[in-house]
Curated annotation (Swiss-Prot):
Catalysed reactions listed for this entry: UDP-N-acetyl-alpha-D-muramoyl-L-alanine + D-glutamate + ATP = UDP-N-acetyl-alpha-D-muramoyl-L-alanyl-D-glutamate + ADP + phosphate + H(+)
NCBIfam families: murD, RPE3
Annotated source species: Rickettsia conorii (strain ATCC VR-613 / Malish 7)
Subcellular location: Cytoplasm
Pathway: Cell wall biogenesis; peptidoglycan biosynthesis
Disulfide bonds: none
Official protein name in the record: UDP-N-acetylmuramoylalanine--D-glutamate ligase
Binding residue positions for ATP: 111-117
EC numbers, comma separated: 6.3.2.9
UniProt similarity note: Belongs to the MurCDEF family.
GO BP field: cell division; cell wall organization; peptidoglycan biosynthetic process; regulation of cell shape
Keyword Cell division carried by entry: yes
Sequence ranges assigned to domain RPE3 insert in this UniProt record: 260-306
Length: 500
């Protein structure tokens, strides 16, 4: 968009993204807005101007230069049909940020699970090294609300956001994993994979694609990009030691990066130093990776650099090993020394509601994984722990908890609540001991009482609902906050100690 011309812009969707777009554009363009939800329109009217609100029946929507669409709006919506009928280009807040920050470097992360943790971890590593890479996107900070940066941005991008980008081009793009999700929006897996793959659009030989080749769908994307030969490819794995790439296997990070793969950036932060790490760091306590493929390669290429994975309660489990592998790869491409990467992994504080360690009492540890809104996501935290008192429930997703059945051996007892309680109970019947509860509070209380009576050395109370939250909560955040509050009550009684 040309800021020298008073163009006419439509902003459709008035959630966090739409509001940030309006604030960015209102003084530069003639802007009209709309949202299907009256509550959002009412909030906008209170904050800004009623005159900017225009229903889709208003002819002004047919005479716009551009429409900025929020990612929550499906491409089957009437507004998209209007845009097509009147040849109005559709753009997004991601493209707007890119347009005004083209001199900066963009690191983009997508995947079905693990996006937020990886986005935050990469930002933490880079910022701890003296760089300036704030997070934005699907992580809770909309693109246009991100703080100004000197070096670049780390963006979490959902499939909905990727469907909308037209000009955004990442310098480094990460594909963590792909499992069936959002098929109500994307119709089928082919469309879903195509949406995820858009993160690599417009990238070239000066760009890097970091891809998890353990995942079948991701490996297909990797092979396709390999055939195209237009992007530098960095594979990563937690199942095998790669001859060229990043692996996190047997408590070790193994990196085989040739000298010519280093990423040449113009760093604006004066405190950044690309020192070569000399020697292998002391071996800290390591994350235990329980599962590897039988065909695991035991031999290391002589040129590998390999380091112990620093133990961090907030980064447990195979899924977090994937997040660590991807983050290490990105930081290595940028030029951060291995010692600094490992220190940053060790000091990383997890995002709320994502396998968040709350604290412990008498060998009972409390973990909040409220973000685990489906079984595939919950599997990751369940695999990471043993002797689990599992809190699960809400509005069930298709397939229920069938994906978790192979890992029921990790669960000591389950506490089911919400709309899913009977469905989950039928799946667990005769396999796992369980209790049906009215709500999360009751489930928490019963789990705590049972864990106190357990003489085992290690006990874990885990909230991994495997469901959406809308039957009893506004969102997964509110659900997770209640779990934290229940833990805090124990803390006030002097029971829980040492959350980190």
């Amino acid at each position: 968009m040309n800021s020298h011309t008073k163009q006419k812009i439509g902003v459709f969707g008035l959630g966090k993204t739409g509001i940030s777009v309006y604030e960015e554009l209102q003084n530069k363009y003639d802007v009209i807005v709309y949202d299907d939800l009256k509550a959002n329109r009412d909030i906008f009217e209170e904050l800004y101007s009623k005159t900017a609100i225009a229903a889709l029946s208003d002819s002004r929507w047919q005479n716009l230069d551009t429409i900025v669409l929020s990612p929550g709006i499906p491409l089957t919506h009437e507004i998209v049909n209007i845009a097509k009928s009147f040849n109005i280009p559709i753009t997004s807040d991601i493209d707007l940020l890119f347009a005004k920050s083209k001199n900066l470097k963009f690191i983009a992360i997508t995947g079905t699970n693990g996006k937020s943790t990886t986005t935050a971890l990469i930002s933490h590593i880079l910022n701890s090294s003296g760089l300036d890479y704030p997070v934005a996107g699907n992580i809770g900070v909309s693109a246009l609300q991100a703080k100004a940066s000197k070096d670049g941005y780390v963006l979490e991008l959902s499939s909905f956001q990727l469907d909308l980008v037209k000009t955004f081009t990442a310098k480094i793009a990460v594909l963590l994993n792909i499992t069936p999700d959002h098929l109500d929006r994307h119709q089928d897996m082919t469309c879903y994979i195509a949406a995820k793959s858009k993160i690599f659009d417009r990238m070239d030989q000066e760009s890097y694609a970091v891809i998890n080749i353990d995942n079948d769908y991701c490996r297909e994307v990797f092979i396709k990009l390999q055939q195209e030969q237009r992007i530098k490819l960095i594979p990563f794995s937690v199942a095998q030691i790669l001859e060229n790439g990043i692996s996190v296997v047997d408590d070790k990070i193994s990196a085989n990066f040739c000298d010519d793969i280093s990423f040449e950036l113009q760093h604006n932060s004066e405190s950044f130093r690309q020192d070569e790490f000399q020697g292998e760091p002391a071996e800290p306590e390591c994350i235990k990776i329980r599962e590897h493929r039988q065909d695991l390669q035991n031999s290391l290429v002589s040129s590998f650099m390999h380091y112990a994975v620093p133990f961090n309660k907030n980064l447990q489990g195979v899924h977090n090993c994937e997040n660590i592998a991807a983050s290490y790869a990105v930081a290595k491409i940028i030029g951060v020394e291995p010692k600094k990467i490992l220190e940053s992994i060790s000091s990383f504080q997890s995002l709320p509601h994502r396998m968040q360690y709350i604290g412990s009492i008498n060998n009972i540890s409390f973990y909040n994984d409220s973000k685990a809104t489906n079984a595939i996501s919950a599997v990751q935290s369940i695999k990471a722990l043993d002797n689990i008192y599992w809190l699960a429930g809400g509005i069930p997703k298709e397939g229920g908890i069938e994906e978790i059945k192979p890992y029921f051996s990790h669960i000591k007892k389950a506490y089911f609540y919400g709309q899913a309680k009977e469905i989950f109970a039928n799946t667990a019947k005769n396999i796992v001991d369980f209790v049906i509860c009215d709500n999360l509070e009751q489930a928490f209380d019963l789990a705590y009482k049972d864990a106190v009576g357990d003489n085992a050395e290690i006990k874990n109370i885990l909230l991994a609902p495997s469901c959406s939250s809308y039957d009893q909560f506004k969102n997964f955040e509110e659900r997770g906050e209640l779990f934290i509050k229940l833990c805090s009550i124990l803390s006030l009684r002097g029971l829980i100690t040492g959350s980190s």
